[in-house]
Amino acid sequence: MSKFTHINEQGNAKMVDVSNKNITKRTAQAHSSITVNETIYQQIIDNTNKKGNVLNTAQIAGIMAAKNTSTIIPMCHPLPLTGIDVQFNWQINDNTTYTLNITAIVSTTGKTGVEMEALTAASATALTVYDMTKAVDKGMIIGETYLESKSGGKSGDYRR
């Protein structure tokens, strides 16, 4: 009935059967960001936020999010992830705003890709920074979240 991969013959949602796919090394890298004011920036780099170490907590949240992606994205397969890395890079915009660029890199050896895990990790990392610093300023801006690259699998490699 349907040519959609995640819809069954009755028109209802289904998770795709990947049992016949080849096992390959798969990686994905995703980006997100959050722009903060100078007070929050100083608290983060000086590690003086009242809730604790913002970047360490956000990094752990990103790792946990990648590991739990299949529990929050309905058609995502649970995967045995072989590596997760969350990295940070500050961009100083002017004397009043600072952007924390977040890179999440996820890898596995499996039958389906890890793009959603990388995107979920990057998103959760930015959300955790917001959560830990919102008492200082609720005007932070979470920026674009997107896939930077992926490798492995039938569709091949992708680079933004």
UniProtKB/Swiss-Prot annotation:
The keyword Ligase does not apply. The keyword Manganese does not apply. It is an enzyme of class 4 (lyase). It holds the Pfam family MoaC. It catalyses: (8S)-3',8-cyclo-7,8-dihydroguanosine 5'-triphosphate = cyclic pyranopterin phosphate + diphosphate. It comes from the Bacteria. This is Cyclic pyranopterin monophosphate synthase. It comes from Staphylococcus haemolyticus (strain JCSC1435).
